[in-house]
Curated annotation (Swiss-Prot):
Its cofactor is Zn(2+). Substrate binds at residues 243, 265, 268, 333, 366, 420, 425. It comes from Idiomarina loihiensis (strain ATCC BAA-735 / DSM 15497 / L2-TR). The keyword NAD applies. One of its GO terms (biological process) is L-histidine biosynthetic process. This is Histidinol dehydrogenase.
Length: 442
């Protein structure tokens, strides 16, 4: 860590161009350059199916891969080896996540919009969904819970989980236990853009799903966006890429807590980004010292150090300026560590998930508070929402008009049809209103 330099900068001393640069995501330019590579992979999977996915799996993950689908026997054998303490932790997280998402069940509604005209809003669970669980250097059973629990509550009939295997063709036992707990029906040993293609287009061992969920690297995020824009019919949840955390802290903040939170996101990957906004130079200096000291003790120090190179410690004029910067940046995670944290909430709406107060670490939301940790990144929190139960449903409308009800609206409908020059639209109304009602009179 002696070579690491984490500068502290005064926001007001930066030019407009410099301010924009300080808030630029490190992985954004790379994501743009990946479009063509991802398109080639997806085209290969679409044309060649399972054979293409197996080839990519051998190239990037398990060189000896012969099949993609995990059997129930393989899952059971792996789960049997899992430590009971880990099972209890997963069970606890499952319960809190289930409780919070169960409370989100959407309710059908029915309303009479005009005499004799009934309109309804109804919800139906998605039939088949795909859950992408990132692999690489970390085991992520928590992501399986975040995706699997709402799919289970919604009642999705087929839930396909994909995750890249290790060199031995295995997935972590903790991940498999979480998947089993959530009722995942199929598990495929593949990752990257090719896994998204397998979910969206279907392969021999696993038919296509209707919607793909889950975070991932730039390849995965780009692949999700591409399949959702072509004619596959597959939807995506939200753009969820490299992790981000922005902390707003004042003099009441504990620098050790702030640094620990920043590092908890920096250790996710070298393309993660963390930002501190504080009106206090003293807080900024103390947080920097804590970052240096705590990072040196991490098992993933090298990864966190790379992320810190693109991270920012910014001293602002006051809390109003901190709020304005946060709203512009629209972070995936926002931590408010001030003496009036809850009072700031109404002004801080552009974030995937907000962590209020000194005793709400971001890692709590990652694992077990109950909120979902699949969140919009890259500034998409301005317009996208965090993942929730409703994302696993289709919403559709129903309308029913009696003969008298149609007559109530006939003039409005036929006039608008005339305005738009759509004669058949008008005729579909008048052919009914000009005939006698066949409705029974009880």
């Amino acid at each position: 860590m002696s070579e690491l330099r984490i500068p502290i900068e005064q926001w007001q001393s930066l030019s407009s161009a410099e301010q924009t640069q300080r808030l630029a995501r490190p992985g954004r330019a790379q994501a743009e350059s990946l479009r063509e590579k991802v398109a080639v992979i997806l085209s290969d999977v679409r044309d060649n199916g399972e054979r293409a996915v197996l080839n990519y799996t051998r190239q990037f993950d398990n060189p000896d891969a012969t099949s993609l689908r995990m059997s129930d026997e393989q899952v059971e054998a792996a789960v049997a080896s899992l430590d009971d303490k880990v099972k209890r932790a997963i069970d606890t997280a499952y319960q809190t996540i289930y409780r919070f998402h169960e409370a989100q069940r959407p309710q059908d509604l029915s309303i009479e919009t005009a005499p004799g005209v009934q309109c309804e809003l109804r919800y139906a669970p998605l039939d088949a969904v795909g859950l992408y669980i990132p692999g690489g250097s970390a085991t992520l059973p928590s992501t399986a819970l975040m995706l699997g629990v709402p799919a289970q509550i919604a009642g999705c009939q087929r839930v396909v989980m994909v995750s890249p295997p290790n060199k031995q063709g295995e997935l972590p036992a903790a991940l498999l236990y979480a998947a089993k707990r959530c009722g995942v029906t199929d598990i495929l040993l593949c990752g990257g853009a090719q896994a998204i293609g397998a979910l969206a287009y279907g392969i021999e061992s696993s038919p296509a799903v209707g919607k793909v969920f889950g975070p991932g690297n730039s390849f995965v995020t780009e692949a999700k966006q591409q399949v959702s824009q072509n004619d596959s019919g597959c939807a995506m949840d939200l753009p969820a890429g490299p992790s981000e955390l922005l902390v707003i802290a004042d003099d009441s903040a504990n620098p050790a807590y702030v640094a620990a939170d920043l590092l908890s996101q920096a250790e996710h990957g070298p393309d993660s980004q963390v930002i501190l906004l504080t009106p206090s130079m003293t807080v900024a200096e103390n947080v920097r010292q804590e970052l240096m000291a705590q990072c040196a003790q991490l098992s993933r120090a090298d990864i966190a150090e790379q992320a810190l190179q693109a991270s920012r410690l910014l001293v602002v004029a006051d809390m109003n300026e901190a709020i304005a910067i946060s709203e512009t940046y629209a972070p995936e995670h926002l931590s408010i560590q001030t003496d009036n944290a809850r009072d700031l909430l109404p002004q801080l709406t552009r974030a995937g998930s907000v962590f209020v107060g000194h005793y709400t670490p971001e890692s709590g939301g990652d694992y077990a508070t109950g909120t979902n940790h699949v969140l919009p990144t890259y500034g998409y929190a301005r317009n996208y929402s965090s993942l929730g139960l409703v994302d696993f449903y289709r919403r559709y409308t129903v309308q029913e008009a009696s003969h008298d009800g149609l007559r109530q609206l006939a003039e409005a409908i036929t006039t608008l049809a005339d305005v738009e020059g759509l004669d058949a639209h008008k005729r579909a109304v008048t052919i009914r209103t000009e005939t006698k009602s066949t409705e029974s009179k009880l």
